[in-house]
A protein has these predicted regions:
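Basic amphipathic alpha-helical segments that dock to polyanions
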Residues: 36-41
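Nucleic-acid-binding surface
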Residues: 7, 11, 16-23, 27, ...
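Short, Lys/Arg-enriched anionic-surface-contact patches
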Residues: 1-4
Length: 198
């Protein structure tokens, strides 16, 4: 028994104070042993199957990713990750496939956009949160197209600021941007904006 607790202690340290039931079970430790461990170490249950030690920081973005694995950070949250805005997002924005029920996320104040399944993975990449965890996010080019596609729900200043910042970037990929714009049917309006900027 003690051997398993020691193993769990090591896992907890390696995971920076966060343990997932599924991860523990797949490492060969039974649920009853794990729940005894949770009680003995006084871990907090922060979400279904996710436990945190008292002294660890909650990485809200990573936690959101673990709980809603198909949600991809997008729109204003993606702008923040790519340094295309100086405004830290007040609420997280994610995109999920059409058909996924977003009510749980919306109830927690997360802004949810939907996209048909065949466009969900376009421009998908990963970034590190401020805590060092890897989460899925859309690249700069996809994000610009998303903002245009959802322009009725986005402040125009946010979009214009992002596009200006993007135009100054050395690592921009205009070819990918125009390719995505065609896929998301925003090519015409994007060209109008780019003609003014570039």
């Amino acid at each position: 028994m003690m051997g398993q607790f020691e193993q769990l202690d090591q896992m907890l340290t390696a995971q920076e104070g966060m343990l997932r039931t599924s991860q523990v079970v797949s490492s060969g430790i039974s649920k009853p042993v794990f729940y005894d461990y949770v009680r003995s170490r006084d871990l907090d249950r922060v979400a279904h199957g996710i436990y945190l030690s008292k002294d660890s920081w909650v990485d809200a973005m990573y936690l959101l990713h673990l709980r809603f694995e198909q949600a991809v950070f997008s729109h204003e949250t993606a702008l923040f990750f790519h340094d295309l805005t100086d405004r830290e997002p007040i609420e997280y924005t994610v995109t999920v496939k059409t058909g996924c029920n977003p009510s749980k996320m919306k109830a927690e104040g997360i802004q949810v956009f939907t996209i048909k399944a065949d466009l969900h993975d376009v421009g998908l990449t990963t970034v590190k949160t401020p805590f060092g965890h890897t989460v899925p996010v859309y690249d700069m080019e996809r994000t610009i197209c998303d903002l245009l596609r959802s322009r009725s729900r986005i402040e125009i200043q946010t979009f214009q600021g992002a596009l200006k910042a993007y135009a100054r970037r050395k690592d921009k990929n205009l070819r990918a941007l125009m390719q995505y714009a065609g896929m998301f049917k925003v090519e015409k309006i994007l060209r109008q904006y780019l003609e003014v900027l570039l």
